[in-house]
Swiss-Prot record:
It comes from Beijerinckia indica subsp. indica (strain ATCC 9039 / DSM 1715 / NCIMB 8712). This is Peptidyl-tRNA hydrolase. TRNA binds at Y14, Y64, N66, N112. The keyword RNA-binding applies. Belongs to the PTH family. The record marks N9 as: Discriminates between blocked and unblocked aminoacyl-tRNA. GO terms for biological process: protein quality control for misfolded or incompletely synthesized proteins; rescue of stalled ribosome.
Length: 198
């Protein structure tokens, strides 16, 4: 089995924030594969699906971003899985909006959600880094990530999250590079790669 974790902050006030694109990706996956309604568990909300013959537990921590590791750790210990079976979907300032990269391990790049998870289960998990771009000034980062996507941005966010969902079986099979390429081509086909997103 695999644990798919989307990072974000709980509550309507944060639901459209750039920082919540991890939640948005998990919700898109749940919709695409007809997942049962999310229920409260592991200090978060969970559901289950099957992809490529693999059981997938979907988790959205409700601990707030900075304590995400508590929720992830609860699930990891309950299912007795290694950190390598965890895939975390999160916003990435260092990638252009709409760009996606998958990596295993590494640093946290200042992301407090990743920092918390690493403290609880080590850094031996895979990350789906979802680009939201950088405001250009370090002092503006907090305001930027906690700001809502604009109406213009919403077009690529919706297309991107759908593409992540459609191609999620590739992640389940460990085909990370193929997953990235499929998403790039989907964005390109939608005409979004021509808007300076990549």
């Amino acid at each position: 089995m695999l644990l798919f974790v989307g990072l974000g902050n709980p509550g309507k006030a944060y639901s459209a924030n750039r920082h919540n694109i991890g939640f948005m990706a998990i919700d898109a996956i749940a919709r695409e594969y007809g997942a049962p309604a999310f229920r409260a568990r592991f200090q978060g909300l969970t559901s289950e699906i099957t992809l490529s013959g693999e059981k997938i537990v979907l988790l959205k921590p409700e601990t707030y971003m900075n304590e995400s590791g508590r929720s992830v750790s609860d699930a990891v210990h309950f299912y007795k899985i290694d950190a390598s079976r965890v895939i975390v979907f999160h916003d990435e300032l260092d990638l252009a909006p709409g760009k996606v990269r998958v990596k295993k391990g590494g640093g946290n790049a200042g992301h407090n959600g990743l920092k918390s998870i690493t403290q609880h289960i080590t850094n031996d998990y895979r990350r789906v880094r979802i680009g939201i771009g950088h405001p250009g000034i370090k002092d503006m980062v907090r305001h930027y990530v906690l700001g809502d996507f604009s109406k213009t941005e919403s077009a690529w966010v919706e297309t991107l999250c759908l593409s992540i969902a459609v191609n999620a079986p590739l992640l389940a099979k460990g085909e990370d590079e193929n997953f990235q390429n499929k998403i790039f081509h989907a964005m390109e086909t939608a005409g979004l790669a021509k808007d300076g997103l990549f």
